[in-house]
Amino acid sequence: AAALTACQGKAAEPDASAAVSEKTGTGASETKEKKQGEKESSGVFESFTAQDLDGNQVDETIFEDAELTMINVWGTFCTPCLEEMPDLAELNREYQEKGVQIIGICSDTINADKELDEAQLEKARELAEQTGADYPHIAMSGTLVDTLLPQVMAVPMTIFVDSEGTQVGTAYMGARDKEGWAGILDEVLASVQ
């Protein structure tokens, strides 16, 4: 499995102590206060290739039908990741009518040679099923190994992208409950509408 071993629990209450530049859905740059648990990330999803947990090819077209996609990077070893997955599944169903989809990316599906690990893929499939996380899940594979994985310092990490795969706002580190994510989803969705 991949060398990523850090796991973050529930995020603390937001702390608006530092300002960062934020990329919006229109590509404009504006200043927004950075909250605790947020991190900037580059636009690795505008052009990528990978496989889902069942071996099907996936690329940036996965974002086309949603106004906003919440990408949750998780690990099979990460208890906080697994604990928030049922809430994410509920949010995926509740926000579909608003043009939002949730996609998971399992961070530990490759071996030291950057090849897919079948045992880890099976474990990821089982955990997604056990947690009721019935939204799409992508394996850390293809171009994501070199573009996304180096940016993942801990899991869960959540990134929002628009229909073209352009990142919206900052990346969020750590798990949250359903209400916490709903508030963030509402705020980010408003910024792309």
Range-by-range predicted roles:
Residues 99-121, 133-142:
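Thiol-based oxidoreductase modules, predominantly thioredoxin-like and allied folds used
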